[in-house]
Design a protein with these regions (language model features):
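Short, small-residue-biased leader/transition segments that mark boundaries at the very start
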Residues: 1-2
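N-terminal localization/anchoring segments of enzymes in phospholipid and broader phosphate metabolism
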Residues: 5, 17-387, 391, 395, ...
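Residue-identity detector for glycine
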Residues: 9-12
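Thr-Gly-centered strand-to-loop micro-motif
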Residues: 403-404, 431, 461, 480-481
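Helical hairpin unit composed of two closely spaced alpha helices linked by a short loop
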Residues: 406-425
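Extended hydrophobic/aromatic segments used for targeting, binding, or gating
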Residues: 412-415, 429-453
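Conserved, well-ordered active-site substructure
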Residues: 471-473
Length: 549
C-alpha cells in the first residue's frame, strides 16, 4: 500500500475521509497526466520516425496532385473537356493492352470513378523511368548469365521419356527464362521452420568459399542473431559473405543504416528496392524471395524468413506452419545465378560469374529425379510462378494438394481450380485459421463458396497460421517456394521456388500435407453463408481492389 502523508495536526481540523479522497484524486490526476505525456511522446516518435516521415511526404505529394485542379478552376471548362477526351483515350488503351483482365478492370474502375485523378495517375504509372531501368538491367543480366545456365540435353531427353508434360514445362522454363532442369541433386524437405533453421546452421558452419543470402523479412532475435554470429565468424575465416534483404524491413524491423553495420563486420550487405518517400510504382515490387546458397553446393528455398515467428520462438498467430527445401548438387547453380542477377541490378559492369559455379557431377543418380529451381520477376512479362501452378493443376491425374497463406485469385486461376475438381481431381486447399492480415482473409473468404460448390475442398489450419507455399500432386510432383496464391506474389513481386519431379522427397511433402490436414477444420458452404455481415461486406468491397492487395 502507498503511504499517505497527512500534515501534523490536520486531523483535528479536517475530515480524514476528505484528506484521503483528495490524495486519491491527486494521484489519479498525476497518472492521467503521465499517460498523456507518454501518448504525446509515442505520437511524436511515430510522426518523426522514418515510416512517419515517409507517409507524410507521400501525403504532401498527393495533396499537391489533388490541389492542382482547384488552382486551375478558372480554366475548368477547357480542362474538363481535355480530361474527358484523355479519359476515353486511356480507357481504350487499357482495353487493348496485354495483361491480366483483373488488373485492367481495376484500372478502368479507377479511371471511371475518379476521371481526373485516375487518368493522370495511370499515365504517371506507365511512364516510370525507374521501372524501365530495372527491367532493362535485368534483361541484360540474364543475357550475361545465360552461358552459365546451359541445359544438359541428356537430362531433357530422359524427362521426355519419363513424363512428356513435365518435359514441356522444362522446355518453357529453360528456353524462355533460362532455368535449366537438373538431375544429380539431393532434396530434403522441411515441414516446419525449426527444422530448416537447424539444418541451415549446420550447413553455414561448413562454408569454405562463399555464402549468399536473400530474404524478404529479417528481424533481430534468436534466429537472426544466431545466423549473424556464424556469418561474422565465417568472414574472419576468409569466406565471402553477401547478404541482401528487402527495403521494407527499414520501416519497422531494422534501422535504415543496418547494411553499414553488417559491412563493418566484413559482410557485403545491401537493401534491395529501398523505400523512398516518392510516389513510385517500383516500390510495389518487393523482393519476396528466400534464398540461401553455400559454396555453390548447398541451397535453401521456401517460405521461411529470418525472424523468430518462423521458428515458433515468438507467437504471433498461433502455431506458425511453414516449409522449406534443401538442395544439394547441380541444381544449386541456378540459385547462385538467381541471387547474383538480383545483387547486380543496381551495379555497373559484369561479375566473374564463373568463379561461383561448381563443377557438375559426372556420375548420374537416377534415384534423385528432376529438379528445376526457378525465379519470377514482375518485369519480364512472364508469370512464372502462376505457369508452374497452372501446369500442376492441368496435368494432375489423381490429386492436387495446396497450402497457401492467401487466396486472392483472378478468374483464370479460379476457373482452373474448379475445372480440375470437376474433372475428378481431388483439389484440397489448406488456409490459415488465424490470419495475419484480416483484410486479405476477408477477400479470401469471398472465393470460398464458389470454390466449394465447384468441388474444391477448403480446410483451415486450426492451430494457427499457414505460411507455407506448397503444391503437391500424384505422389511424383511438387513445388515449394515463396509464391503465394495472390496477385502480389503472382504478378508484382520478385519470387522463387523449386519444381521437383520423381524424387523420393515428394512423398514426404504429401505426408506432411496429410499430417497438417489432420489438424484442420473443413469449411462448409453453410459456414460460409453464416459468417458475419461486416466481414461479408468488407470482403466484397475489398475484392474490387484485390489486384492491389
Amino acid at each position: 500500500a502507498l503511504p499517505i502523508s497527512v500534515p501534523e495536526g490536520s486531523l483535528g481540523r479536517k475530515n480524514p475521509v476528505r484528506i484521503v479522497w483528495s490524495w486519491i484524486k491527486e494521484r489519479k490526476s498525476m497518472k492521467e497526466q503521465s499517460k498523456k505525456t507518454v501518448a504525446k511522446k509515442k505520437f511524436f516518435k511515430m510522426v518523426f520516425s522514418r515510416a512517419g516521415i515517409f507517409v507524410i511526404l507521400i501525403l504532401i505529394q498527393l495533396l499537391v496532385f489533388l490541389g492542382i485542379p482547384y488552382y486551375l478552376k478558372e480554366y475548368a471548362t477547357f480542362i474538363y473537356s481535355a480530361m474527358s477526351v484523355m479519359e476515353i483515350v486511356v480507357l481504350v488503351y487499357i482495353i487493348n493492352t496485354e495483361g491480366n483482365p483483373a488488373f485492367k478492370m481495376t484500372w478502368m474502375l479507377c479511371v471511371m470513378a475518379l476521371p481526373v485523378i485516375g487518368t493522370v495517375f495511370y499515365i504517371y504509372v506507365h511512364l516510370q523511368l525507374e521501372t524501365r531501368f530495372v527491367q532493362n538491367r535485368l534483361a541484360a543480366l540474364r543475357m550475361e548469365t545465360e552461358p552459365y545456365m546451359d541445359q544438359d540435353e541428356k537430362v531433357t531427353e530422359a524427362l521426355w521419356a519419363s513424363k512428356s508434360a513435365n518435359a514441356q514445362l522444362s522446355y518453357y522454363l529453360s528456353h524462355q527464362l533460362g532455368f535449366p532442369t537438373y538431375r544429380n541433386t539431393e532434396v530434403e524437405y522441411f515441414p516446419v521452420g525449426e527444422d530448416k533453421f537447424a539444418s541451415m546452421i549446420k550447413e553455414l558452419e561448413k562454408a569454405e568459399k562463399f555464402i549468399f543470402m536473400e530474404y524478404f523479412i529479417v528481424e533481430e532475435g534468436i534466429m537472426w542473431d544466431t545466423i549473424l554470429e556464424i556469418l561474422k565468424r565465417k568472414v574472419n575465416e576468409g569466406v565471402e559473405v553477401r547478404f541482401m534483404y528487402d527495403g521494407m524491413c527499414a520501416f519497422d524491423l531494422l534501422p535504415y543504416s543496418y547494411p553499414k553495420k553488417l559491412q563493418k563486420f566484413g559482410i557485403k550487405c545491401k537493401m534491395s528496392n529501398k523505400i523512398r518517400p516518392f510516389v513510385s510504382t517500383i516500390q510495389n515490387n518487393r523482393d519476396h524471395r528466400k534464398i540461401c546458397v553455400i559454396d555453390g553446393q548447398t541451397g535453401y528455398v521456401g517460405g521461411v524468413n529470418l525472424a523468430d515467428e518462423y521458428i515458433n520462438e515468438k507467437e504471433r498467430f498461433g502455431h506458425w506452419k511453414d516449409t522449406a527445401v534443401l538442395l544439394r548438387g547441380d541444381a544449386v547453380q541456378s540459385l547462385t545465378m538467381i541471387f547474383l542477377q538480383m545483387w547486380d541490378v543496381d551495379m555497373r559492369g559484369v561479375e566473374p560469374y564463373g568463379k561461383y559455379l561448381t563443377k557438375k557431377a559426372e556420375s548420374l543418380n537416377d534415384r534423385l529425379g528432376y529438379v528445376i529451381p526457378y525465379a519470377d520477376s514482375p518485369f519480364d512479362h512472364e508469370n512464372v510462378g502462376e505457369e508452374v501452378y497452372f501446369h500442376i493443376l492441368n496435368h494432375a491425374k489423381k490429386y492436387v494438394h495446396i497450402m497457401t497463406p492467401y487466396l486472392i485469385l483472378d478468374n483464370e486461376m479460379l476457373t482452373t481450380l474448379i475445372r480440375a475438381a470437376k474433372s475428378g481431381i481431388e483439389v484440397i486447399i489448406i488456409m490459415p485459421h488465424i490470419p495475419d492480415k484480416w483484410y486479405a482473409f476477408a477477400v479470401a473468404k469471398t472465393y470460398y463458396k464458389e470454390l466449394i460448390e465447384g468441388g474444391v475442398q477448403i480446410y483451415e489450419y486450426t492451430p494457427g497460421f499457414v505460411h507455407a507455399k506448397v503444391f503437391v500432386s500424384d505422389d511424383d510432383t511438387a513445388t515449394v517456394g515463396s509464391i503465394n496464391l495472390d496477385f502480389r506474389s503472382l504478378y508484382l513481386h520478385f519470387e522463387n521456388g523449386v519444381f521437383i519431379y520423381d524424387n523420393p522427397e515428394v512423398q514426404k511433402v504429401e505426408e506432411d500435407f496429410q499430417n497438417t490436414l489432420a489438424k484442420c477444420h473443413k469449411v462448409t458452404v453453410t459456414e460460409v453463408r453464416n459468417r458475419g455481415v461486416l466481414m461479408k461486406v468488407a470482403g466484397q468491397v475489398l475484392r474490387l481492389v484485390a489486384p492491389l492487395m
